[in-house]
UniProtKB/Swiss-Prot annotation:
It holds the Pfam family Rhabdo_ncap. The modification Phosphoserine is found at residue 389. This is Nucleoprotein. Its main location: virion. The gene is N. Phosphorylated by host. Encapsidates the genome, protecting it from nucleases. If expressed without protein P it binds non-specifically RNA and therefore can bind it's own mRNA. Interaction with protein P abolishes any non-specific RNA binding, and prevents phosphorylation. The soluble N-P complex encapsidates specifically the genomic RNA, with protein N protecting the genome like a pearl necklace. The encapsidated genomic RNA is termed the nucleocapsid (NC) and serves as template for viral transcription and replication. Protein N binds protein P in the NC through a different interaction, and can be phosphorylated. Belongs to the lyssavirus nucleocapsid protein family. It is found in: Virion; Host cytoplasm. GO terms for cellular component: helical viral capsid; host cell cytoplasm; ribonucleoprotein complex; viral nucleocapsid. GO terms for molecular function: RNA binding. Keywords: Capsid protein, Helical capsid protein, Host cytoplasm, Phosphoprotein, Ribonucleoprotein, RNA-binding, Viral nucleoprotein, Virion. It comes from the Viruses.
């Protein structure tokens, strides 16, 4: 008997079949490179740099750019940015460069060129008869890469913010060592015609390559990263938020995870810490895995580890962090339960409020204060009639342990205490809540309870 078949009856007919499902082409894919090959890209015929510069600059001024031409130019211009590799550079077993070697950004990738010629029109660019300088090339490359960062800014009411960011980036690329090559507000005008360029694989690939190079190599034109820095740890917000969290609470990753009391964390933590990834290696391909196309659906994104993401930002909200209050709640990942756990852990790592004496004239004064606080706690615990049951857990000698926190949650039947709710309401009510944000969630769920 075939162990993969099932038998059942339909209208007096016995049916035997083997259930099969479609293959999941969108399953999580880890970025580890196993074939020993550098990330690769295929582009059209390499252009003459001078011709390409004039054509692209003409397109910038006319707010009409061809993405294939831009990508071909960006790849060709990499040869202009020579730098010295500070250390031996190896990632996933691939030897990228040796310490002291002179390298350019294209050392990171394999570029395949076809015979397809670009549309190097000269309209509007013929007034420039001389060859452009390296500074002019660098300025144009920088402005083009800024289109990536601008296209990553999404959401409601971002027009003014985008305009301000674009203006500031323009100012960078008209100040030494760069030179002014376009008129003011050109970048924002061009962006409106290229608003979705962050979704173009080749453009994203080249932005990630430039960023990976200038993040490692000290260079006169390192400010080119202003437009590409968003490619670092792209689609990796789950892992990034956890890293920031453990640094803030000053615990190791192992010790921090002992506080994650929910069965939904098991699969997410297993997914996030898959062996073989170069999360702790300096300047690996891992940092830019999304841009370089070595991973499909990221296992490190906020949606991939949504319970974990929700918990960390509820703790951040309890601590009053604006970044957490503005973050978007993953609605399908138990936000109510995560807010409860976030309240207890927020109290554990942050205390009851913002105001607490932390600085002293000398060590003796600090010790005297600690002794006084200890005596006050002991006195409160000794008199059961004077301690508010809602506050009693706060005055325990073993507060900072996973066992103690778990016990408090169980004693309160998995519900928040009034002090937790007051804290949540306090930090969220004074914040201008964005749609679907943690601040909005806390306002809606807990404002009436307070």
């Amino acid at each position: 008997m075939d162990s993969e078949r099932i038998v059942f009856r339909v209208h007096n007919q016995v049916v035997s079949l083997k259930p099969e499902i479609i293959s999941d082409q969108y399953e999580y894919k880890y970025p580890a490179i196993t074939d020993g090959k550098k990330p690769g890209i295929t582009l059209g015929r390499a252009p003459d740099l001078s011709t390409a510069y004039k054509s692209i600059l003409s397109g910038m001024n006319a707010a009409k750019l061809d993405s294939d031409d831009v990508c071909s130019y960006l790849a060709a211009a990499m040869q202009l940015f020579e730098g010295v590799c500070p250390e031996d550079w190896i990632s996933y077993g691939i030897h990228i460069a040796t310490k002291g070697e002179t390298i350019t950004p294209d050392v990171l990738i394999d570029v395949t060129r076809t015979n397809v010629e670009g549309n190097w029109a000269q309209a509007g660019g013929t007034d420039m008869t001389r060859d452009p300088t390296i500074a002019e090339h660098a300025s144009l490359v920088g402005l083009l890469l800024c289109l990536y960062r601008l296209s990553k800014i999404v959401g409601q009411n971002t027009a003014n913010y985008k305009t301000n960011v674009a203006d500031r980036m323009e100012q960078i690329f008209e100040t030494a060592p760069f030179v002014k090559v376009v008129e003011h507000h050109t970048l924002m005008t061009v962006h409106k015609m290229c608003a979705n360029w962050s979704t173009i694989p080749n453009f994203r690939f080249l932005a990630g390559t430039y960023d990976m190079f200038f993040a490692r190599v000290e260079h006169l034109y390192s400010a080119l990263r202003v437009g590409t820095v968003v490619t670092a740890y792209e689609d990796c917000s789950g892992l990034v938020s956890f890293t920031g969290f453990i640094k803030q609470i000053n615990l190791s990753a192992r010790d921090a995870l002992l506080y994650f009391f929910h069965k939904k964390f098991e699969e997410e933590i297993k997914r996030m810490f898959e062996p073989g990834q170069e999360t702790a290696v300096p300047h690996p391909y891992f940092i830019h895995f999304r841009a370089l196309g070595v991973s499909g659906k990221s296992p490190y994104s906020s949606t991939a580890v949504g319970h974990h993401f929700n918990l960390i930002h509820f703790i951040g909200c309890y601590m009053g962090q604006v970044k957490s209050l503005n973050a978007t709640v993953i609605q399908t990942c138990a936000p109510h339960e995560m807010s409860v756990l976030g309240g207890y852990l927020g109290e554990e790592f942050f205390g009851k409020g913002t105001f607490e004496r932390r600085f002293f004239r000398d060590e003796k004064e600090m010790q005297d204060y600690a002794d006084l606080e200890g005596a006050r706690v002991e006195a409160s615990l000794a008199d059961d009639g004077t301690v508010d049951s809602d506050d009693e857990d706060f005055f325990s000698g073993e507060t900072r342990s996973p066992e103690a926190v778990y016990s408090r949650i169980m004693m309160n039947n998995g519900r928040l205490k009034k002090s937790h709710i007051r804290r949540y309401v306090s930090v969220s009510s004074n914040h201008q809540a964005r749609p679907n944000s943690f601040a909005e969630f806390l306002n809606k769920v807990y404002s009436e309870s307070s």
